[in-house]
UniProtKB/Swiss-Prot annotation:
Name of the gene this protein is made from: epdD
Organism taxonomic ancestry: Archaea, Methanobacteriati, Methanobacteriota, Methanomada group, Methanococci
UniProt PTM: The N-terminus is cleaved by the prepilin peptidase EppA, which recognizes the class III signal sequence.
Function of the molecule: Minor component of the type IV-like pili. Essential for pili formation.
Location relative to the cell: Secreted; Cell surface; Fimbrium
Protein name in UniProt: Minor structural pilin EpdD
UniProt KW Glycoprotein keyword: yes
Length: 67
């Protein structure tokens, strides 16, 4: 147990610990950004589908009045 603690508090171990915390922060930020991109793309997809449906319904109404 004390050997593991000595590795944590040595200069080389401290640099490794700082690097692992930095990598963890970068990975966490990438996960959050990816989640945000997926959620926002789903919202855009839904709004685009609604727009397409409204345009289609308007076109069908206009064409049904002509014939």
């Amino acid at each position: 147990m004390s050997v593991a603690l000595k590795k944590f508090f040595s200069k080389r171990g401290q640099l490794s610990l700082e690097f692992s915390v930095l990598v963890l922060a970068v990975i966490t930020a990438a996960i959050l950004l990816g989640y945000h991109l997926i959620v926002s793309s789903k919202a855009v997809q839904e709004s685009n589908i609604d727009t397409i449906n409204n345009t289609h319904n308007t076109a069908i109404d206009a064409l049904s009045e002509v014939s």
